[in-house]
Design a protein with these regions (language model features):
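Compositionally biased terminal segments of proteins
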Residues: 1-149
């Protein structure tokens, strides 16, 4: 697969997700790059499983990462179609609870786990990534779809 370089904050965040056993999948531009179409991206997009135990783990990760806001609660990660953004592009981290066209459980069961720039990462598999890109229908997603194998 393609060589990908992660910002140090992204590496730290992914390591924390792994250390806390968060059920997550890397999606978006970094996943597209992993499958052979490296392109500029403004953020690290992470899809998280939507259930209470996982939401608690995500909150623990965010606090350890330095994002300890009084409004931070597990409830933020228990709603469908929720997107939480941390930081600014190109170093933004985006957490989402739902994406178009695919089911987290199915995607998690089919995940690809690999070491990316020295960090173990759970990625959405290529078939589900393509399904998501097609279902999303955004211009960038359709362009990605044309370049994926």
């Amino acid at each position: 697969m393609a060589t990908i370089h992660l910002l140090s904050d992204f590496k730290e965040f992914l390591r924390l997700l792994n250390a806390h056993h968060v059920e997550y999948l890397l999606i978006g531009g970094y996943a597209v790059g992993y499958y052979g179409y490296p392109r500029a991206t403004a953020d690290l997009e992470v899809w998280i499983a939507l259930h209470p135990a996982n939401a608690d783990k995500v909150v623990a990760v965010l606090k350890e990462f330095g994002f300890d806001d009084p409004e931070l609660s597990a409830d933020l990660f228990l709603k469908q179609w929720q997107i939480i953004r941390l930081g600014l592009p190109p170093a933004r981290i985006e957490l989402t609870t739902t994406i178009s066209g695919v089911d987290f459980g199915e995607c998690y069961a089919a995940q690809v786990t690999d070491v990316v720039d020295g960090v173990r990462v759970n990625l959405i598999d290529l078939d589900h990534l393509k399904t998501n890109k097609k279902a999303s229908g955004r211009h960038q997603d359709l362009a990605d779809l044309e370049h994926l194998p």
